[in-house]
Regions:
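Transmembrane helical segments that form the transport core of multi-pass membrane transport proteins
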Residues: 100, 130-133, 137, 150, ...
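Membrane-interfacial helix-loop connectors
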Residues: 34, 82-91, 95, 107-108, ...
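N-terminal secretory/membrane targeting signals
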Residues: 1-31
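Structural signature of hydrophobic alpha-helical transmembrane segments
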Residues: 40-53, 108-119, 162-171, 231-242, ...
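Interfacial loop-to-helix junctions that mark the boundaries of transmembrane helices
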Residues: 36-47, 67-72, 97-111, 225-234, ...
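Hydrophobic mid-bilayer segments of alpha-helices in multi-pass membrane transport proteins
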Residues: 48-58, 68-93, 110-122, 173, ...
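Juxtamembrane and boundary regions of transmembrane helices in multi-pass small-molecule transporters
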Residues: 186-190, 194, 202, 206-207, ...
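Hydrophobic alpha-helical transmembrane segments
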Residues: 51, 76-77, 114, 148-156, ...
Length: 441
């Protein structure tokens, strides 16, 4: 209740601050000196307005659960306002071209990450449509495991699956297993779901594909593909220690089997194989050819498109043959609905657009010079280790995407070990609070 009142007070203060700035005639801003790169805007009223706009947008993002306003909407508008203010002020000082170049640079970074994530999401949706995850859930439910065994199995699977899929998909899958098994046992469900979130976040921290933050670090070229795997032991410890503590809260009982056996649809195993081949292609393009990983991922999308085409052709021949045997009829019904573009359409577009807003907002604030100031305080005065630990703590309060993108934009001069540390803390820091990660939410 106190948190809710505090949020309302903060929101009102930000609105009042923005309104106060808004009544100042903007024409009096433009004639002030603006340094190259936007650094002169740090103490400029337009800089303050940009901060206020970003804070207001992020308050709306944090209140998504209560307002039911999609998180992408406020940050997209905030990004447009911030860059519009910066461009307007810079145009009057002759720096318009520099602003355009900076905006294009941030947009290119977003485009690479968005296309990469889009391919990964398409494959995950295709595997979901082929009932890969349902089959795994069905197998786990009816194996007569006890609650404690299921607690460790679901948590361990979350840790192992999230590096290949992503922590949100993994958490949804494993929590569905827990709900199917635990049902009315709320104690087991709550403890097991916490364990899954911790496992998924920890597992995603040691793989470039496990979380958006690790993908950002890899795409930026700060760490090589294989460097992430040196985080395996620290990530494992981050999972095992909380799991060992939670183990004693799990009831020592056995659930009832209430689920029917579910089989994967035809083509499911080949789609899994194509996804692994796509990952290999992306890594090979980056490591051996020096190309952006997104080109390899989009090539992998072509693999899936061709396979979908062949799958449809095979089913059309089966339908034209008029074979209505029960076994074939089930197969036809399973295969015909598959369509690659419908899988693309079902991607997490709100997340992708939210990511656009965050990248552009943070990029705009970075152009103004606020990130340089933050970098000076955090990495020059506090030291890299302290700063990177603080990044992890911030990730539990604020979404780890803007926090990590801000660090990457600051681009502090750090050793590989420190970059690995901030990658780990940003990934697992979200486990401290339920709102700290997409999996937790």
């Amino acid at each position: 209740m106190r948190q809710g009142k505090a949020g309302i007070v903060i929101k009102r203060l930000v609105i009042m601050h923005a309104a106060a700035l808004g009544v100042i005639p903007v024409t009096c801003f433009a004639n002030e000196t603006i340094g190259s790169g936007g650094s002169g805007l740090v103490s400029h009223p337009i800089g303050y307005m940009s901060i206020a706009v970003f804070l207001l947008a992020y308050i709306l993002v944090a209140a998504e659960e209560f307002t039911h306003l999609r998180k992408s909407k406020p940050v997209i508008i905030a990004a447009g306002i911030i860059w519009g203010l910066v461009a307007w002020a810079s145009a009057h000082s002759g720096n318009g071209h520099a602003v355009e170049e900076a905006a294009r640079h941030n947009l290119l970074e977003y485009a690479e990450l968005m296309l990469f994530l889009l391919v990964a999401m398409t494959y995950i949706n295709a595997m979901e449509e082929r009932r890969v995850f349902d089959a795994l859930r069905s197998w786990l439910v009816c194996r007569r495991f006890g609650f404690r065994a299921l607690f460790w199995m679901t948590g361990t699977l979350a840790f192992l699956i999230s590096p290949i899929a992503d922590n949100l998909t993994t958490a949804l899958l494993m929590c569905a297993v827990v709900l199917a098994v635990g049902g009315s046992n709320s104690r087991f469900v709550s403890v097991a779901c916490v364990n899954i979130v911790v496992g998924a976040n920890a597992g995603g921290a040691f793989s470039p594909f496990g979380d958006i933050t690790t993908l950002m670090v890899w795409q930026k070229g700060v760490l090589g593909f294989w460097a992430f795997f040196s985080l395996f032991i620290p990530a494992l410890v981050n999972y095992l220690v909380p799991a060992a503590i939670l183990h004693f809260a799990v009831p020592d009982e056995y659930p009832e089997c209430r689920a029917e056996k579910i089989s994967m649809k035809p083509g499911a195993r080949r789609i899994i194989g194509l996804f692994l081949l796509t990952i290999i292609t992306a890594v090979s393009f980056h490591n051996f050819l020096g190309l952006p990983p997104v080109i390899g991922m989009l090539t992998g999308l072509g693999y899936l498109q061709f396979f979908g085409y062949l799958l449809k052709r095979a089913d059309q021949r089966l339908l034209k043959g008029g074979n209505t045997a029960d076994s074939d009829a089930g197969r036809v019904g399973d295969v015909v609905p598959f369509d690659v573009f419908s899988r693309v359409a079902r991607a997490e577009w709100d997340t992708l657009l939210f990511f656009y807003g965050v990248v552009m907002c943070v990029g705009g604030l970075g152009y103004i010079g606020y990130l340089a100031l933050a970098s000076e305080v955090m990495y020059s005065q506090w030291g890299a280790t302290t700063a990177n630990i603080v990044v992890g703590l911030l990730s539990s309060i604020v979404d780890n995407i803007p926090v990590m993108f801000a660090v990457l934009t600051m681009n502090p001069d750090m050793s590989t070990g420190q970059w690995l540390l901030v990658t780990l803390t940003a990934g697992v820091g979200g486990s401290l609070l339920s709102i700290g990660s997409a999996a937790g939410v």
